[in-house]
Each structure stands twice: as structure tokens, then as C-alpha cells.
């Protein structure tokens, strides 16, 4: 028989940097989950990511206070900023440009994000990422 689920916790945790301090500790403590067990398991599972990369994580808490978790791919905005070494997007998207990004770079980001996107092929995934880049005030150029 399957375990009874008591709830889900959605957090954005930096890869390899899970520790019991807020926001992780209080969120897990309210559900009665062993915080150190989660931190050790999360840090072990995210060892292949660059340390500090924000990873959306969904933690499933069961009635016996055990847990399982799934990590998603890093947010598109993080990957876009990392691809062109940008600190932040434009304060006025559509008016002021924060920089330029090549369509080939967007395609690479789309390949990474493909499993988390609601897209059937790489072209539509690239268009989704392109929309995120434009919303950040970036100019998309061919290349």
C-alpha cells in the first residue's frame, strides 16, 4: 500500500547549499520532517550542479513524517542571466534594453529546460525561453 501524503512543500533551494536555516528549516519543521536528513539528501543529489544554482524543489511529505523530493531545472531567467553574464534584467522592458542574446544561446537553454516546459519540440521551447528573455528587456539577435 502506498504511503499517505500529508502535503507538498515548494522551495527554491541553492544547489549544494541546503542547510537548516530559513527558509528550509521552518518550512520542513512545520511538517515534522527531519531537516538534516533532507539537507544531506538534497546536497548529495545536487552535487553535479554548480554550487549555488537555484533549483525549484517539490518536497512530498508523508504521514509517517518521511519525505521524497524532486528537483526541477534552474529557472529560465537564471540560465539567461548566466549565459550573457548579466546581473539583472532591464528596469523598463520594451523601452530600455538590458543587452543582447543570440537565438543559439536560447536554443541551448531550451534544451536544458525542455523536460520542465510545456512544449512538444525544441522550436516551441526556444520560443518560450525567447519570451522570458524579452520580458527581461533583452534583445534577441540571430546567431
From Swiss-Prot:
Keyword list (alphabetical) reads: Methylation, Ribonucleoprotein, Ribosomal protein, RNA-binding, rRNA-binding
Q: Which residues cross the membrane?
A: none
Q: Please, one GO biological process term?
A: translation
Entry PTM: One or more lysine residues are methylated.
Q: Which family does it belong to?
A: Belongs to the universal ribosomal protein uL11 family.
**What does this protein do, in the record's words?**
Forms part of the ribosomal stalk which helps the ribosome interact with GTP-bound translation factors.
Subunit arrangement?
Part of the ribosomal stalk of the 50S ribosomal subunit. Interacts with L10 and the large rRNA to form the base of the stalk. L10 forms an elongated spine to which L12 dimers bind in a sequential fashion forming a multimeric L10(L12)X complex.
Name under which the protein is recorded: Large ribosomal subunit protein uL11
Source organism per entry reads Rhizorhabdus wittichii (strain DSM 6014 / CCUG 31198 / JCM 15750 / NBRC 105917 / EY 4224 / RW1) (Sphingomonas wittichii)
